[in-house]
Curated annotation (Swiss-Prot):
Summary of subunit composition and partner proteins: PSII is composed of 1 copy each of membrane proteins PsbA, PsbB, PsbC, PsbD, PsbE, PsbF, PsbH, PsbI, PsbJ, PsbK, PsbL, PsbM, PsbT, PsbX, PsbY, PsbZ, Psb30/Ycf12, at least 3 peripheral proteins of the oxygen-evolving complex and a large number of cofactors. It forms dimeric complexes.
Organism of origin: Pinus koraiensis (Korean pine)
GO biological process, one term: photosynthesis, light reaction
Membrane topology label: Single-pass membrane protein
Transmembrane segments: 7-27
Compartment list: Plastid, Chloroplast thylakoid membrane
Protein name as catalogued: Photosystem II reaction center protein M
One Pfam entry name: PsbM
Similarity annotation: Belongs to the PsbM family.
Length: 37
């Protein structure tokens, strides 16, 4: 299956942006809870 670069980048962004939005608060809370432990 051949995928052009623009489509690959679009999919990458589509996956990366929501992942970052979910991951950043999770890492902050995880580091905060581990720090208080």
């Amino acid at each position: 299956m051949e995928v052009n670069n623009l489509g690959f980048i679009a999919v990458l962004m589509f996956l990366a942006i929501p992942t970052a939005f979910l991951l950043i608060p999770y890492v902050k809370t995880a580091s905060a809870s581990s720090g208080s432990n």
